[in-house]
Design a protein with these regions (language model features):
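Acidic, Ala/Val/Gly-enriched low-complexity intrinsically disordered segments
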Residues: 4-6, 10
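Conserved alpha/beta core of the MobA/IspD/sugar-nucleotide pyrophosphorylase nucleotidyltransferase superfamily
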Residues: 11, 17-40, 198-238
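N-terminal glycine-rich phosphate-binding loop and ensuing alpha1 helix
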Residues: 34, 39-98
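Structured catalytic core of nucleotide-sugar glycosyltransferases
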Residues: 43-45, 69, 73-87, 102, ...
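Short beta-strand segments
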Residues: 47-49, 92, 150-151, 175-178, ...
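Conserved beta-strand segments of alpha/beta enzyme cores
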Residues: 62, 115-117, 213-215
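Acidic donor-binding segment of Leloir-type glycosyltransferases
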Residues: 87-91, 95-117
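Conserved beta-loop-beta/alpha segment of the NTase-like Rossmann-fold superfamily
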Residues: 115-189, 193-196
Length: 238
């Protein structure tokens, strides 16, 4: 379930994120056992690698403010992820690198937090699968056995939502909002090898192939993403 713009990941009636709804790419044939899927060594992954080309404005959408004088989309998403206390936050960058993110004073201050680590995806333009691979490689190197993945342009996922999914008992745990699946999604290490090797999809194909691995967790807030200026205005007007 993922899809990105500056992919780092609600209270607004707009379209659901495409994060795990893609249909391209391949899934490997090995099937993990769902046993041992619970984890107390989990990292948050915020996908923030895309160009945000649908947001037609003078600034990248992650630097757009939710209100005239309020925080930016990225700042809000990051703060919610940090406040969840799930674990370290891996921010996968791409079109915007570390220097671009640090140009925003508030973001620069957040990036000084030792809980946040930037992981660059040099092949960000090839699709989301590469960003997920960067994330799982980083998690493996750090000794984590699960990641909870969301998008940087989803500022309405609450800290409580991040925690609820992190505490999920499935090899794959997915948030639901009024019965509809959305981000974030927790992926235990046992399924990392089954993620698409290429393309712009996340975990949707795997969830469809192995529904027995999936646990749904009802969450408050919203997984709505802000892809366009119209999305932002719609949220502001509601």
């Amino acid at each position: 379930m993922f899809n990105v713009a500056v992919t780092f990941l609600v209270i607004r009636p707009t379209q659901m994120t495409q994060m795990w709804f893609g249909e391209t790419g391949g899934v490997r044939d090995e099937v993990p056992s769902p046993s041992g899927a619970t984890s107390h060594d989990t990292a948050v992954v915020m996908l923030a690698a895309g160009a945000g080309s649908r947001f037609e404005a003078t600034v990248h959408k992650l630097f757009a403010r939710l209100t005239a004088t309020g925080p930016t989309i990225l700042e809000t998403s990051l703060r919610h992820a940090i406040e969840s206390d799930v674990g370290p936050v891996f921010v996968v960058t791409g079109a915007l690198d570390a220097s671009a993110l640090s140009a925003d004073r508030q973001i620069a201050q957040l990036l000084d937090d030792p809980r946040i680590q930037l992981k660059h995806n040099p092949s960000w333009a090839d699709g989301q699968a590469g960003s997920l691979r960067v994330a799982t490689d980083a998690a493996t190197a750090a000794g984590h056995d699960a990641i909870v993945v969301g998008l940087a342009d989803q500022p309405f996922i609450t800290p409580e939502g991040w925690r609820a999914v992190a505490d999920g008992l499935g090899a794959i745990t997915v948030a639901t909002y009024d019965g509809r699946r959305g981000n974030p999604v927790k992926l235990h290490a046992s399924v990392w090898g089954l993620l698409p090797a290429s393309g712009d999809e996340g975990a949707r194909v795997l969830m469809r192939r192995r529904p027995d691995l999936v646990v749904e967790v009802p969450c408050s807030g919203s997984p709505a993403d802000i892809d366009t200026v119209e999305d932002l205005h719609q949220w502001q007007n509601n």
